[in-house]
Amino acid sequence: MTDYRTLFSSPGAGSTVTTPITLSLLLLLSQATSDPCYDPGGRPRFCLPPVTQLVGKAAAPCSQTCALPAASPGPACNSSLTLDLDGSFLLTSVTLRFCTAGPPALVLSAAWATGGPWRPLWRRPAWPGALGGPKKVTFHSPPGPKTRIVASYLRVEFGGKAGLVTTGVRGRCQCHGHAARCATRAQPPRCRCRHHTTGPGCESCRPSHRDWPWRPATPQHPHPCLPCQCHPIGATGGMCNQTSGQCSCKLGVTGLTCNRCGPGYQQSRSPRMPCQRIPEATTTPATTPVASRSDPQCQGYCNVSVSSVHMSLQRYCQQDYVLHAQVSASSSQPSEAVGPEWWRLAVHVLAVFKQRAWPVRRGGQEAWVPRADLICGCLRLRPGADYLLLGRAAQTHDDDNYDPARLILNRHGLALPWRPRWARPLRRLQQKERGGACRGLLPPTRSPGPRN
């Protein structure tokens, strides 16, 4: 291996020859490794792939015209020729070669998709008394960014017999100024995108660089895609919306870059959950009165309070309904008294895992809770929270407001804080019930009423 120190040593044998050669090689190497889409300082700039010979698919009409004598009538000629470029390209020139004098009139059109609409690019009208045109016709795309022609199909309409020999179409891939290289033979042609763009034609930004909407590059401004400014803790990742730049935020986090806590949340010290819900101090009867737990009349009234339940098939079948619901967090009137014995709560049913005789529909519902159950703290419901509700259908009641279609929440059921991991096993139990697994498993008898 050559030591570079010998190439730039003091004059001696061969040093005057090797120094210019080495400088030339280094210059060529720097030109080969430089990126046309970036200047020497690393700043983005407008770039285009080189012009290449494009491949078209078409059969030249009247291909035997050149071999026929001049006096021979010859076969009937087609009136047009369509070229499929196998992709979208920026056209630079179209060349048509004829074996005899070309047709007196020609019309060249371009289209984006199969069947048009066709856009006329060049028209050569027939002069009165003209017998034919030249044997070679070349169309050049006009210069300027506003006059660039993007086409996937070309159509040539002849005004007479045409003995067409070859068609030459030159152009470059449509990379919107964001690429200097392109695989023209790929299906579809794919640009080697720069400026953090992506897509076959560099027509969109990468998911991690969508701080501004995508724009094509121009010689005046390269319009590179900018990285998303997502907060490293408040966002779920580094990707943002293509149009607005909105980052995907964690629960309780808001803002375009996920940099602050939303309403009802406060900052925490956990990087996994940077915003936690603010505990609500509420006086609604839906919460548990602490003083009522020492009331002698409430001793032994409620069922044993549990925080978790093993949901076996038998326990599931013994329930009249199993719901995933959310207690309304409205601050106007989440609950109200209805008569001396009942309170009415607004709930939103999110999922029904077991249906009762009177169907419970998803959406907004009115849940009825006995006043005594609330006073004794049998149900601990917090507005805005999700719960798994296990309960029994209403039975005969002496109250005039009784309705068998009511959704009753009482001390005989359970209201457990919802856990997302419960959804899948509950769906499996629901499928078993539909298959008849609950037949013969009757619910146990309920207690007749409160004990004094």
From Swiss-Prot:
Function description: Plays a role in neurogenesis. Prevents motor neuron cell body migration out of the neural tube.
Disulfide cysteine pairs (residue numbers): C173-C182, C175-C191, C193-C202, C205-C225, C228-C240, C230-C247, C249-C258, C261-C275, C298-C376, C302-C378, C317-C438
Alphabetized UniProt keyword annotations: Developmental protein, Disulfide bond, Glycoprotein, Laminin EGF-like domain, Neurogenesis, Repeat, Secreted, Signal
UniProt name for this protein: Netrin-5
GO cellular component: extracellular region
One biological process term in Gene Ontology: neurogenesis
Domain NTR, chain residue ranges per copy: 298-438
UniProt superkingdom: Eukaryota
Annotated signal sequence range: 1-34
Main location (coarse class): secreted
Domain Laminin EGF-like residues, every copy: 173-227, 228-277
Glycosylation sites: N303
UniProt subcellular location: Secreted
Gene ablation phenotype (knockout): Deficient mice exhibit ectopic motor neurons that migrate out of the ventral horn and into the motor roots.
Species the sequence originates in: Mus musculus (Mouse)
